[in-house]
Amino acid sequence: NIKEAVSEKVGNVSEINISLTNALIATKLNAEIVMISTRENGFPTRLYPVMSDFNYIISKVKINDKTYFLDATDKLVSFGILPFRCLNSYGRAIDFQNPSDWIDIIPENPSKNDLLGILKLQENGIITGKIKKLTTLYEAKERREEVTPLSNDAIISKFENNFKNIKVISYKNENLKDIDKPLIEYFEISIENGDINGMHYLNPFFENSKMSNPFKQEDRLYPVDFGYTQSNTILFSLELPPNFKVVSAPESQSLSLEQNAGNFTVKSAIESFKVTVKSTFTINKSLFYNNEYASLKELYKQTIAIYNTP
């Protein structure tokens, strides 16, 4: 009951998103509802679709020749971004004046999870510096869900528990509640690095050094559906005292899937008193078919091996 949902300000998914569509139409925008099947519900049949294939309704609006998909049920989803459960490749657009039609539902832009670390090794062996973490779109939504309920002290404690010998001196964030902007977090840190036979060791890939391969099976019968494309860049810079030198750094190299469907690159630069390492891991399409599974799994395997190189 749409009227009741509007009056009571409470409703199910269909009532809320139909109300949203009606509101958009009332403002003279080109809007219509789209029936979809959520990820857990499976794909609807394209050839002979039936109502029982669908279990969810979203809204579609066209503004200045650009199409946006909307869902008003999740307060942490920004304009034009659907909840992850709705990313199931396609849906059925319903125009009550014209025949219904299939429409692709694939996010345009990659979700980013980037990290910048500017560090300095002190004469006493302690490393100090700052880390900036930036997330966008679905990566930002996931991070907001993680940190919104927590105090700054709890966020610091969780960060320190994930990394051996790291102490967080201060923490702050930007745009936590402004969901249309990237979420930016700042950590000021110190690292009790420890001296092992006169050597200091530091993994420049930070949280990615704990990454594990999500693909365990030898073969796969069904597609791998990430839902969205993604990009992860880490830029690491370490300044050294004059009496220190870099013995080794990650080797510059590149890995890539066919048609650039996914890739990993790492580049290292060593100057007189400074080492810089930049790595980028990208998944450039959201859906991989079963015949692409082996190469996708191998990309993850080789990337993780580099992340974990001593």
Predicted regions mapped to residue ranges:
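A sensor for short, sequence-defined functional sites
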Residues: N1-P310
